[in-house]
């Protein structure tokens, strides 16, 4: 069985033969994951991740808090689902062909997934990455074979924003395929048809609330939309990091209040959280079905990551920690006896030089709180 990205992987045979077979195999790929016990390449190992009861949070809140262990996908994140859907859809539409280059703007995880799955299908991969991404992720992307372009963090109105750079790269190049994870609805579909249905089946329909952070919006939108359809009483909430405008969008209908706009448009999100928090309403996020939004701080995320490692042996990344902060806030809002689900979207392996580095934490004025209780969640 494939473990996360730290295992070896090879291309699925000769690339010429792959391209001839891609279109014929797409439907089979979507149906056969894990069914036979033998996977036809890495692309079939995506999904069907465990749902983990987080004991410490459950006991402290009086709710049942579960984490969907998406870090156990072969590429280490839920972006494997998105990459698979985007690639298979691109092949089906004839947009991906022999010699194509997949181009994307990514904070790392989508890039890892696109590179692994793209290489396994015989494609080149070029990634535009904001400069707040951890060195571990960039090194890994290059090791996996991606061409990386590191660009400064700037506001969405700046032509040098990493999303604009990726889009411009593809103009006029028929062999360049813009994955466009932010607005490509294959992202939403991957979670609506996959992750959400798995959660519903694993909980046997016993879900009172769902909470997660959003970047592209595909995970939150796909899961919240499906859960709301099967049970309109489910409470779906967003947890949003500093510098992101989605908290305001959900609660007030506008991305920013005027007093915040100039600062954020100039600097962009300042948070160390990778892959979550944006200042743009994406096509994927537009399909979300949310009841409200919480704000989560950097300090809460740091403390939660260390709390879960100490009490549950869960070695999680920043985005997963933020989601767990959201789970505690939602549990407090709904009250004891409820079942809350969130997404454990990344492991701590890609954060060893930052979130789990004493020197980095000290340099950035973070001090881990008393981890005997959840008082650090405000």
Swiss-Prot record:
* Organism, scientific name: Dictyostelium discoideum (Social amoeba)
Q: Does the keyword Amino-acid biosynthesis apply?
A: yes
Annotated pyridoxal 5'-phosphate binding lies at 215-219, 319
Q: What is this protein called?
A: Cysteine synthase
**Record's superkingdom?**
Eukaryota
The processes (GO biological process) annotated in the record are: cysteine biosynthetic process; cysteine biosynthetic process from serine
Here the segments flagged for biased composition (Low complexity) are 15-28
Q: Which reaction does it catalyse?
A: O-acetyl-L-serine + hydrogen sulfide = L-cysteine + acetate
| The UniProt record lists the keyword Signal | no
State the pathway, as annotated in the record.
Amino-acid biosynthesis; L-cysteine biosynthesis; L-cysteine from L-serine: step 2/2
Molecular function, one GO term: cysteine synthase activity
Residues in coiled coil: none
Q: Which cofactor does it need?
A: pyridoxal 5'-phosphate
A GO CC term attached to the entry? cytoplasm
Record key words, sorted: Amino-acid biosynthesis, Cysteine biosynthesis, Pyridoxal phosphate, Transferase
TM helices/strands, residue ranges: none
Positions carrying N6-(pyridoxal phosphate)lysine: 79
SUPFAM superfamilies, A to Z? Tryptophan synthase beta subunit-like PLP-dependent enzymes
Task: Name the segments for region: Disordered.
Answer: 10-31
Q: Which PROSITE patterns match?
A: CYS_SYNTHASE
List the InterPro entries.
Cys_Synth/Cystath_Beta-Synth, P-phosphate_BS, TrpB-like_PALP, TrpB-like_PALP_sf
User: Mind telling me which Pfam families this protein's record contains?
Assistant: PALP
């Amino acid at each position: 069985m494939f473990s996360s990205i730290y295992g070896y992987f090879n291309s699925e045979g000769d690339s010429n033969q792959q391209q001839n077979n891609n279109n014929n195999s797409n439907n089979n790929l979507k149906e056969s994951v894990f069914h036979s016990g033998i996977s036809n390449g890495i692309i079939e190992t995506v999904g069907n991740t465990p749902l983990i009861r987080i004991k410490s949070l459950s006991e402290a809140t009086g709710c049942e808090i579960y984490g969907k262990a998406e870090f156990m996908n072969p590429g280490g994140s839920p972006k494997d689902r998105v990459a698979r859907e985007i690639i298979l859809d691109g092949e089906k539409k004839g947009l991906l062909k022999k010699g194509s280059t997949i181009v994307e703007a990514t904070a790392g995880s989508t890039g890892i997934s696109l590179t692994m799955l793209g290489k396994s299908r015989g494609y080149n991969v070029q990634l535009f990455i904001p400069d707040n991404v951890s060195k571990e992720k960039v090194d890994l992307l290059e090791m996996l074979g991606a061409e990386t372009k590191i660009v400064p963090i700037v506001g969405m109105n700046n032509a040098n924003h990493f999303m604009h750079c990726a889009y411009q790269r593809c103009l006029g190049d028929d062999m360049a395929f813009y994955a466009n994870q932010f607005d490509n609805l294959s992202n939403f579909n991957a979670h609506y048809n996959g992750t959400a249905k798995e959660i519903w089946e694993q909980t046997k329909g016993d879900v009172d609330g769902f909470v997660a952070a959003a970047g592209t919006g595909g995970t939150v939108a796909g899961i919240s939309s499906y859960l709301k359809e099967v049970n309109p009483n489910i409470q779906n909430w967003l947890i949003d990091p500093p510098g992101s405008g989605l908290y305001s969008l959900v609660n007030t209908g506008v991305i920013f209040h005027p007093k915040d706009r100039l600062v954020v448009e100039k600097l962009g999100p300042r948070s160390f959280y990778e892959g979550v928090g944006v200042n743009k309403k994406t096509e994927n996020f537009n399909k979300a079905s949310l009841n409200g939004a919480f704000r989560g701080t950097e300090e809460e995320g740091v403390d939660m990551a260390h709390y879960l490692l100490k009490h549950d042996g869960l070695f999680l990344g920043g985005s997963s920690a933020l989601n767990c902060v959201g789970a505690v806030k939602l549990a407090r809002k709904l009250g004891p006896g409820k079942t809350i689900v969130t997404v454990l979207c990344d492991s701590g392996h890609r954060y060893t030089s930052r979130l789990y580095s004493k020197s980095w934490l000290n340099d950035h004025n973070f001090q881990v709180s008393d981890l005997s209780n959840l008082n650090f969640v405000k």
